Amino acid sequence: MSPGDSALDYAKRQAGNVSSQAPSRPSSENDANGTVSTSNEHPSNEAGPSRPRSMGSERSASPQQGTTPKVPTKRRRLNAELAFSSPGPAFQVEQHGSEAQSDSNDSSGRARRPRRSTTLTKSGSNESQDRRSSAHIPKRKEEAGESRNLAESVPKNKLKLNNGKARASDEVELRESSLSLVLPSRSRSRSKSVVKLEPDQDSAFPQEVATPTLQPTRPKPQITPLTALNPQAALSEILARRRSERIALAQSDLEDVHDGHDMLVRELFHLTKFVTMVGYDPDVARTDQSDVFTTFKHAHDLRFSLDDSGSGAEASTAARVTRRRVNARLESLSLKRPDPPSTPSTPSFSKVKVDDDKKSAPEGRRNRRFSSVTGAQPRVNGAHTLETGHSDDTDDSSEEEDSEGSDLDAYSPDGREKGDAKDYNASRKGDAKRARLSSTPHKRHRAKVQDASSNAPVKRTGPRKSKALDELDAFILRQQPRPLPDHPPPLHILAPHQIPAHRRFGGDLDALYESFNMLQDDEGGLEDDDLETYIKLDQRWRAGLPIHPEAGSTTRHAVQKVPRNKSHHDHLLESVTSSYSQMRQYAKLKQQNSRKVARMIAQHWERQLGTSEREKKAEERRLRALAKWTLREVLKQWRLAVNVVRARKAAAEKAEKEKSDKEQLNAILEQSTAMLKKQHEVMTRADSLDDSDDEGSDRTNYGSDGSAESEISDIDDDDNQLIQIQDELPSVSPEQSLDMLTPVPEEADGSKDRVSNTTDHEAATANGDPTVVVESESQPSRRPQRRTARTKTFKARDSKLDADDIEFNDAGNDDEQEDAELERQMLEEDEEDDSEDAGLAADANIPIEELLKRYGYGQEADQDAEDSDAGEDAVSNDDSLENSATKDGSEDVAAVASIKIQEDAEVEEERPVQEDSMPDEAMDLEDDAVSTALNRPSDALLVDDHSDAESAATSGRRSSRRSMTRASSIVSSDRHATRLRQPFLLRGQLRPYQQIGFEWLCSLYANGVNGILADEMGLGKTIQTISLLAHLACDKGVWGPHLVVAPTSVMLNWEVEFKKFLPGFKILSYYGNQKERKEKRIGWNTENSFNVCITSYQLVLADQHIFRRKPWVYLVLDEAHHIKNFRSQRWQTLLGFNSQRRLLLTGTPLQNNLMDLWSLMYFLMPNGATELPGGGAFANMKDFQDWFSNPLDKAIEGGTSMNDETRAMVQKLHAVLRPYLLRRLKSEVEKELPSKYEHVITCRLSKRQRFLYNDFMSRAKTRESLASGNYLSIINCLMQLRKVCNHPDLFEVRPIVTSFAMSRSVVADYEIKDLLVRRRLLQENVWEKVDLDVTNLRITDGEEHLTAIESRDLRRLNAAKKLPHFREAVPEPRELDTWTLEGFERSREQRKLVDRMEKWKHMAYLNQYRCTKRPIYGSGLIKMLTEAGEAARLEPLEQHESDRRGFLTRCDSVLRIVQSRSTRRENMQALIDRFAFVTPRAVAVDMPRWALPGLEAHQRPDMVKREFDTVHPVAVKLHIAFPDASLLQYDCGKLQQLDILMRRLKEGGHRILIFTQMTRVLDILESFLNYHGYRYLRLDGATKVESRQALTEQFNRDARISAFILSTRSGGLGINLTGADTVLFYDLDWNAAIEAQCMDRAHRIGQTRDVHIYRFVTEHTIEENMLRKANQKRLLDNVVIQQGEFNTETLAKRLDWTDMLDESGKIGDVEVVVADQGVGARDVESAFLQAEDDEDRQAALRARHEMFIDDADFEEHQPSTSRPNTASATPLAHTASDGARPDNGAHAADALDAHEIENEHQEQEQEQEQAASIDDYMLAFVESDWPFFA
């Protein structure tokens, strides 16, 4: 037998098992009648491999007494089995009753815990393989429902028993084979062996189909249609066949459901574990039987999900599950096959005895408890019996009886099942077994399975059911749902309408089945009757009559519901609803009253039981609370008293401090006034000199001609020789040389002790201890000694100047002449090198004393220290020093430095200044002193004539080239009032104001005071400093070393200035990387290795450990505002340097507030003013803030006018700062400096600018940003508006307009219609219908054969006017007169006349056209033109000019008329450029195809050539519209004004500097200047530092360059652009101080023309607000600061973004919310940088990097002190009381204070005795014991 036939036979037998019929009547033996009802074996389409599940519900039964009992199957049991909830391992539909019962017993409703390993021994396959093979079975959900319905519809009387042995054998084989296929191993662990089932030798079919396939081919069972059945077959056979098909279909659907669920569980497991389905393989998933998956599958088993009783996985896992319990459950749920028989040939039969448990429900013979147990009995017993081979002892005795009784009780003798208890009792005829069975209907029945190998029943022995199984059964019983009751519950009818309707068919299902009329029944008569009825109804419907004649109308009326009278029940319900709310309220009220009563009773008894104890506790709590409150109030009063006393003490201390501060301020003012007075007296001693100055003293530059340069070079050479001689002398040691040339310091009080070095003091000051008093160093006392001839009165020099005298060049000389002069001087110096070497060699053999005398450095022999009192004989100017020498035999050599202000200081101490009482007088004195010092005429510089003469006698080679006379050297007869001479080492001539500054610096050095030179930019602070250092070398013998710290960008400028004006100094430029700096430090500590060291702020911080160890004479800080922050690391580092003197150079000593100025002042005087002669102390930071900073800041920020008190405070501040600060403005000191004029040019917005401006302001986002108050958003909006004002391309670039190119034109869509129209139009020849030759409309017809002469002759032959009726009018035709013959003839003749006249008229018309035909050109002209050129076509003359041979055969005059395409384009280029600018919105690229339909590119290859496309540029202009270059100017109002301004400046020969803030504006300006053809240069932040000087020199030298465009962020302080006399600010910068610096680049020394400053401001924009705020600040600066004469930068701070708003805080009509967010200056600067473009941002950063290399140090907070015993770095000056008050005054004050304290104590005691108030007592007590309370 083939596998296919085996599978088919297996399916048939399986379907037969399900649909086996029951016997007609029960019998304990064989059927008496011998009738055996055989069931038809219906074909089944199920294949063998598709049934891998065990038929665990089947039991093997052995024959008893040689008979095989017939097991009936009831319809109710079939219905129950079709709806079972736990499929279990045997997932199939069973029809046999015994099998159904076995399934009900075996398949428990509880959750089965799956085994970790399930192994099948059948043909090497396991359960997983079987499930995998069955996973591909198609779904059968629909067929399952049909099979279930069909099984329910089977009539009871159709069932029959099957008692054939072959049938029983097949059933046993099938059960055993299916059991052996899928019986799993119930071992608890993997180590145990699996349960192996031996194959049944008699069942060959399961062995053949045991091996599953991966893709089982199991076709879906089909339902045989009724038409395919045998018409002669009985109805029972048809039903049986249909039943078997339905059951097979349902079985297939159930298997599909199970397989589909299994695959879904596996997919869910994969998703749960691996999240994604990427690596999911169905074939691999089917073979997965791991422990993890088995556990996961157990939670999703269909047995638990379909079990409605709740005894699944959820119920079973609720309690604690032990191993014993699990094993017991697994044993109870496992299905084990009994051992095979010993004799293989003996077939095994199975007898299944089933008790019909469900029949008790309709019969009502069982109570509710046992019916529920029986109805939901889990299939446990059968499975347990089959596995263990024995059952419980309690079931042995009744098992056989139960099984027999179940067979007999099910059916009555007539084969019908009884529906009630009476029929059932009548059918049992006194049978004992039946009586026993009937007497015990509620007994629990179990099926008995006997061994197939024995004939007699096998007695089961073994242990009883375990306790775990009892608990499991009890748990299952508890979890099972309550089944339906055996009898329907009683109906509680409350109303008539609630009475149920009668059942149809009496509730009998059989009657319902019999009511159906099946096909092929002998009921044709009914169909005939119905047919007649249908015919009649159809006829009425077709006739339009109503279908039901009795209706009478076709309108359907709704059936009205008959109103029902209210019954008693209705009234009862209404009363219940109405009284319900009242009852609820009454119940709540009763509950509330009950609670109240209960509480009252409880409170009563509580009071009765514990009243006394409770009252005691309450009283105790009250007293404790009262005590706490009293204590709190008393402490509050004492705290108040302490606070009052503390406030009194603080007020007294504050008053005392104010008093001491006032005294200190007065002392400072007194000291400053005295010092200023002395400076005024010293600097005005030469007022008696003759004021007649030579014109050379007022020259505008300190460069001189060749003679002056050679003279200073000679002086420098002398000095160099002197230094060389001193170095080469072996007899003089360095110490002796130092004693001879270096001054000896002296203390300020005149003592003879040496002064210690100031390094320790400055280090201590840097550490924050400013109270340490260190002896100050005095200035050097030695100076070059004048000769005796210098004491005589100088004689007046001859007014005539020799040829060798110094001539001052005018400022208008060109730079080229100066460069040539410098080159000539350098050549002369090179020629003199040989002679200088010879002079040095001769001087080398001269003793040092003679050399000193020769060069004016003689030593005095006077050693008297009293010479300091006779100052009128020893000093000649304000820095004259006493000459002292060492005494004989003394070890200490002291040089006394006397200051002329000591005597005046003593006088001032005797006459104290009452600052408070007479402030006006003091201020007047100060103002007079300053005005006298600043406004006095420029005095002449004196040069000793005798000294020069003797020097010339010593070195005659230089006397001829040195001028001994100056025009300004006229002195008075007072020899002691001579001014300081200019150092002879200094090359060049100082200006008068520079000479004053030089003398002021010298006086500072002489007085031992540090100072600030704060001249305005461009006044020569550098040359004044160089002059001071030269003076120290020449007159004091102090050669350094000096340290100059400058910004990196001006280090080169310092080196150049030193080499230019002081070449005799050795300059060390300290820069480079670490290695280069290390090489430059070689010989660092060698004496005279260098005189001046120039470095930057960055390097001085990097190498501070090196600079700190070296002693410096002068520490010069250029751009000293770099140390304005005393908390910065730079300030603290430089403060600790070892330097004798300090000089600060800055153009802006006060940038932000007065604390910046205080930082500079404290840096100058770390010890305060005590080191000055006369004592005194400079204020500390807090006092300075209280005195000056806070009041002035408040007055300035408030914007109000200053009151008298504030004005007096400002005057005091001027008086304090004036002795240490010198500041001159260019407008004050440089009288010949050209004027500066400022202009504001308002510009209108262009149309595009106005559109963009209004569009941006109208945006919702802009309004939201302005109203938000976020300063970042507001600044961004302001920056966008400024871009629109500067140029619209900055905001939005004008686009390049192009046409939209369409690959397919619109005409292409109508191609088909066009062809259709053309075809229809061309069907007829239009020229055949219309003769154009008649009307001369064919204009080209006569061009070839008609000439002009012929046309003239034709016009002559025109005879139209001679034709008849030509001039007569044609009458109107009349109607025919048919009334009479005459009338008819008349009308007829008239018609003929009309026709004749019309004919002649038409002939004349045609003749007129034919005779007037004339050609346009004529054949003659065409022939002539053709003959003039080539015969093919006329060509331009350019193509034939090269052909000389054809000169005679062509007419050049004619050919010149013909122009080529290129020539014509050139001639029309102006029109093309002007008008070819409009581009179409869209173009189509396929238009040539439609415009020239018959012309192809291959037909005319010459048209494809590039030369042919001469109109391509024109086409490009029409396709792509580039913005016109002129739009760059006309789109911007500022550029329109700039065009007008540039034209006017160009005509006047002016040159302009154009400044802007934005880098992109520079690009636009470049395009603008290139468009107009102006020459220009550009300098921005990206320009390298070394290129800036070259650009500057090129602009100043080349007058052809009209403009220089620069960025305000370009940096480079000190750039000289005096070649331009016009400055234009294209846009306003955020920082107004930057604009001042930009102006100074043109308006500075060297400028010969007036400078005009222009500002472009766009009207009605935010630029007007910016200009208004800037003007206000400049006005306030002019009123408040310039009057102080010490600073112009107080209010030159950055413009705030709020300044650009209107006075009402609006921009246009949009109100801007200004939120107070505490935004700092750095935040605002960062916001500005963010709002700007990237290029401008980078330029600003580079500029700031150049100006402030370590800008981060300015904001750096002071580092916290980490070391103990280290004071803060914040400097505090001495108080006024330190060392200022004498001892006797202190003792007197102490005695007075003690006396006052005693008096106060006595008064307090008296007040305590007489005090009537507790408050006074408390205050007095606190004051008496204040140390305790404090």
Swiss-Prot record:
Catalytic component of the SWR1 complex which mediates the ATP-dependent exchange of histone H2A for the H2A variant HZT1 leading to transcriptional regulation of selected genes by chromatin remodeling. Residues 556-628 form the HSA domain. This is Helicase SWR1. Residues 16-42, 57-70, 98-108, 117-127, 1759-1769 have a biased composition (Polar residues). Keywords: Activator, ATP-binding, Chromatin regulator, Coiled coil, DNA-binding, Helicase, Hydrolase, Nucleotide-binding, Nucleus, Transcription, Transcription regulation. InterPro entries: Helicase_ATP-bd (IPR014001), Helicase_C-like (IPR001650), HSA_dom (IPR014012), INO80/SWR1_helicase (IPR050520), P-loop_NTPase (IPR027417), SNF2-like_sf (IPR038718), SNF2/RAD54-like_C (IPR049730), SNF2_N (IPR000330). Belongs to the SNF2/RAD54 helicase family. SWR1 subfamily. A motif (DEAH box) lies at residues 1118-1121. It is an enzyme of class 3 (hydrolase). One of its GO terms (cellular component) is Swr1 complex. It comes from Mycosarcoma maydis (Corn smut fungus). Residues 177-186 have a biased composition (Low complexity).
